């Protein structure tokens, strides 16, 4: 994982995605996305070249995507959920099928992500993968003389009040692996298994300083000395903390780690489809990919594009083309009973 964000000379790449044509008629894009995916460093060149103005609203959990679209989908043109949620939006009829022949760099994307059931279904494409990584754990180096290797550290009573967990149902997954072994299929847990997971997470609650919702919130918890250890969006928050000279260490637990991939989707009946398609092409172009990776420290979906801006050491550090690493992660997919998982997680948070 990255200890600091990459410095990438985007200007040397040029406006490859949208800069080869004249600026189109102006349009607007309202997007619902994660922090880091609409940084001005790469959004402004897109806006200048395309004539499309982008406005972002940020989420802290995948559960926000269906909730916000179901109650006001017309407010957004594009969304970027993880691939365990893209299929939910498809089933709800909230997103458009895409013509991959109009996506210039589609065939350069990793096949594992192009063919993921959250991206392609029934011979149609419903998402454009942009970035991927792990749900790692991270800790303040000076607080742990002995480096932790297991997720069980998150239940260590000596760390009471110094632990933070992501406010997301995926906390169920790592807890299930601890209880039932790392080979358990965490997306099809039985009622009995989910009850045991709930009990384990409720037992953890007195140790939790706060369930974090956004990258910025977690960074502030560390910067203020309120927490010493948490789970994390691998590479991103640790890089933000490194910029404040706070030395963090990331690790993948011996119980195995979640893998995630995020994909942009076009909202059903968007009136701004032309600008939306320009953005979808841009985010998987050399400039878009290098911009996203440079800001977030995540791995990119288009390794061909990234070879133009990453050194060989950076490319290796991000596990680009490291299929052994990719396959070692438990890549998210939609739980068989997603509503039940959300119910369990909400019950954990509500427990006294």
Where are the predicted features?
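A ligand-binding cleft/hinge motif common to bilobed small-molecule-binding domains
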Residues: 85-88, 229-247
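Mature extracytoplasmic/periplasmic domains
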Residues: 262, 267-326
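Ligand-binding "clamshell"
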Residues: 90-97, 121-125, 240-252, 314
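Conserved C-terminal helix/tail region of periplasmic/extracytoplasmic solute-binding proteins
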Residues: 324-352
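Early extracytoplasmic/lumenal segment of secretory-pathway proteins
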Residues: 26-88
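Periplasmic-binding protein-like
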Residues: 194-204, 244-268
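Paired acidic/hydrophobic, glycine-rich loop segments that form the ligand-binding mouth/hinge
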Residues: 76-81, 211, 228-233, 249-250
């Amino acid at each position: 994982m990255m200890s600091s964000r990459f410095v990438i000379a985007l200007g040397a790449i040029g406006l490859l995605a949208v800069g080869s044509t004249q600026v189109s008629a102006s349009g607007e894009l309202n997007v619902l996305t994660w922090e880091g995916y609409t940084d001005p460093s790469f959004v402004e060149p897109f806006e200048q070249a395309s004539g499309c103005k982008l406005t972002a609203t940020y989420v802290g959990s995948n559960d926000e995507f269906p909730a916000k679209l179901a109650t006001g989908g017309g407010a957004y043109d594009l969304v970027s959920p993880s691939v365990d949620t893209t299929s939910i939006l498809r089933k709800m009829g909230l997103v458009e099928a895409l013509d991959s022949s109009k996506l210039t760099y589609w065939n350069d994307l990793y096949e594992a992500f192009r063919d993921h059931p959250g991206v392609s279904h029934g011979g149609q494409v419903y998402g454009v993968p942009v970035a991927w990584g792990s749900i790692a754990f991270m800790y303040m180096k000076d607080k742990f003389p002995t480096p932790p290797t297991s997720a069980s550290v998150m239940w260590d009573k000596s760390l009471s009040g110094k632990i933070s967990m992501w406010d997301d149902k995926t906390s169920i997954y790592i807890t299930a692996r601890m209880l039932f072994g790392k080979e358990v299929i965490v997306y099809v847990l039985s009622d009995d298994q989910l009850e045991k997971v709930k009990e384990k997470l409720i037992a953890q609650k007195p140790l939790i300083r706060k369930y974090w919702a956004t990258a910025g919130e977690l960074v502030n918890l560390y910067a203020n000395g309120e927490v010493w250890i948490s789970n994390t969006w691998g590479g991103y928050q640790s890089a933000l903390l490194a910029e404040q000279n706070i030395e963090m260490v990331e690790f993948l637990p011996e119980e195995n780690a979640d893998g995630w991939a995020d994909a942009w989707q076009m909202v059903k009946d968007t009136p701004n489809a032309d600008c939306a398609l320009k953005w979808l092409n841009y985010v998987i172009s050399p400039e878009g990919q290098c911009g996203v990776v440079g800001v977030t420290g995540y791995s990119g979906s288009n390794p061909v594009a990234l070879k133009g801006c990453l050194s060989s050491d950076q490319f290796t550090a991000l596990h680009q083309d490291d299929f052994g690493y990719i396959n070692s992660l438990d890549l998210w997919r939609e739980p068989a009973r997603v509503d039940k998982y959300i119910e369990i997680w909400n019950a954990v948070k509500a427990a006294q």
